[in-house]
Amino acid sequence: LRQNWLKSYKPHVYKKMMDFPRKIAEGESIAIIQFQYDYLCNFDCEHCCIDKFYVPKNWEKASGRRKFELEDVRRLSKEADELGLANFVITGGEPLIIKEYDQLVEAIDPSKFYLVTDSNGWHLDYEKAKHLKKIGVDKVQLSLDGASAEDHDTFRRAPGSWERVMRAIDACKDADLHVILSTVIWKDRIYTDEWRNFLEFAKKKQVGTYVVYAKPVGAYENVTDQMMTETEGKILQQFEEEYDIFT
């Protein structure tokens, strides 16, 4: 069904994806571009991997932060398209607080890519979801790191954020915008009832889950004891047989 949709909605992207088997066989890249246009964020999460690049809780004043310019984005889009790449993910920070977000999407050119945006869901209501769909965004990847409001809000250091994600999931579905969850997994979490409860929740909501391994960078730079090992990796593979999750 997704292929049929892509073929009619974004034929250029479909054509590039259909060429992936040949590219793989010939050793060419089919890389997904995960693109951090700006590090602006309205959260101060416990595990933030880019916390050294912005001023927590003062993002409006962080004028000296690193960022791309729109002309850089146009050049990147052109080069990626010429390489036959087909997937583009706008990440951050929190992409939906970028003031020139619409211009950013236009600079990427949605007709050339299957376009995904990350979001913590705080600003994503139905009207916003409809707008994202209208300007060419194909999928939203919502961050959710707990099966309960208490777990998620504590991890994200943002009271009320779990409820905002719940709203965002429904908003995307109502706007016919593809949606998946993104969650961080670390050594201790995979052994908890909370982890299975989280996966059961995603299954009930009929949304897939992208599982991100915690890494010893940013705010987790010195939290090496919580990194996944081969043992936990094998346990995660067992969960993959039961739930719609991928890494």
Describe each PLM feature range.
Residues 135, 143-145, 150, 154-247:
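Radical SAM enzyme [4Fe-4S]-AdoMet core and its adjacent flexible, acidic
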Residues 1-24, 200-204, 234-247:
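C-terminal accessory regions of radical SAM enzymes
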Residues 2-139:
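Conserved alpha-helical substructure of the radical SAM core
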